[in-house]
Amino acid sequence: MKKQRNLRSMAAQAVEQVVEQGQSLSNILPPLQQKVSDKDKALLQELCFGVLRTLSQLDWLINKLMARPMTGKQRTVHYLIMVGLYQLLYTRIPPHAALAETVEGAIAIKRPQLKGLINGVLRQFQRQQEELLAEFNASDARYLHPSWLLKRLQKAYPEQWQSIVEANNQRPPMWLRVNRTHHSRDSWLALLDEAGMKGFPHADYPDAVRLETPAPVHALPGFEDGWVTVQDASAQGCMTWLAPQNGEHILDLCAAPGGKTTHILEVAPEAQVVAVDIDEQRLSRVYDNLKRLGMKATVKQGDGRYPSQWCGEQQFDRILLDAPCSATGVIRRHPDIKWLRRDRDIPELAQLQSEILDAIWPHLKSGGTLVYATCSVLPEENSLQIKAFLQRTADAELCETGTPEQPGKQNLPGAEEGDGFFYAKLIKK
């Protein structure tokens, strides 16, 4: 029996770690969920994701409701009030229960003397909710994005930035990839139907299925046996451009957590795949995915900027470079990105991408294919990156994806219900 814990205080502390310490929610949340009962795991996730998704609004409201911000050791209370406001605004939790549990959270964070303050702020919001929300909806904070990112989106997409922002603020659908070595998509959809769930095939990506309602993976037919993998439709699009073939030597660079490594092997089971990532910890997930799907690949820890250190002079028939990026295309899936990224990160990431591209190109065979992919929507990391690479690389040729003036294919968040993603297919002359 798991000890009863105050979920509101746990959520407040998690959000504080993201915003104040720059930690990723995907690292913070799983250990916290291990401490609570199964029925509370989903609520804890909802509170953390929801507060981070609407952080601009909650911050704006607190500034209106309080004369002075909470600082120092009392800063966690600021986030606890956010959790309370989020429940009142966005959940079906009865207001009296939301208030009571949030106020009790002050004891869990060892600030019992502030219970009255928390209660007072939340009750004041209830009284003034209508006029506060009317004022908020006329402010720039209503877009729920940091101003630096909003400016970049407005500049890059003068006609589309609002729809991008809107898509980023939605909850994402759950996409799956059917393992074609086990089942056709249609036969697996029939199994899903028998299990009482409904799925929809993607029009363009042959293995992709969108669940009508997100479900825990253990409820999916054959998940433990590798029949299906959780992967967004846009990420699955990489295989359309890579087109791996049996017998080829293929490099998956920046491979963790291994979703694309295993997709290569589903499409071309007899390919010789090398999966490389700089992050040794995340490589454990590549091993886990290969094991669950019963597949084999050569997995290496290495820096994409220095390929000779981990592959010598080896050349590959195909290279998938899923480059490190701002992840601005997957904000709906990872709302903490809005608060982890900084404007100054973008030129630094673009420089890193450029260095990896230049370093890995000599390891592509003549006539070979390199697919450059990111989950970003920013031109500096995408079309401008590839345009500059083509200009300085005489034996590189753009293929099937865009034009030399506007290279690559950019999927925007929410288009065909997928994440924001960029692909460019390059051939070595």
Curated annotation (Swiss-Prot):
Keywords: Cytoplasm, Methyltransferase, RNA-binding, rRNA processing, S-adenosyl-L-methionine, Transferase. GO terms for molecular function: RNA binding; rRNA (cytosine-C5-)-methyltransferase activity. One of its GO terms (biological process) is rRNA base methylation. It is an enzyme of class 2 (transferase). Its EC number is 2.1.1.176. SUPFAM superfamilies: NusB-like, S-adenosyl-L-methionine-dependent methyltransferases. Pfam families: Methyltr_RsmB-F, NusB, RsmF-B_ferredox. It comes from the Bacteria. Belongs to the class I-like SAM-binding methyltransferase superfamily. RsmB/NOP family. Specifically methylates the cytosine at position 967 (m5C967) of 16S rRNA. This is Ribosomal RNA small subunit methyltransferase B. It comes from Escherichia coli O139:H28 (strain E24377A / ETEC). The lineage of its organism: Bacteria, Pseudomonadati, Pseudomonadota, Gammaproteobacteria, Enterobacterales. The gene is rsmB.
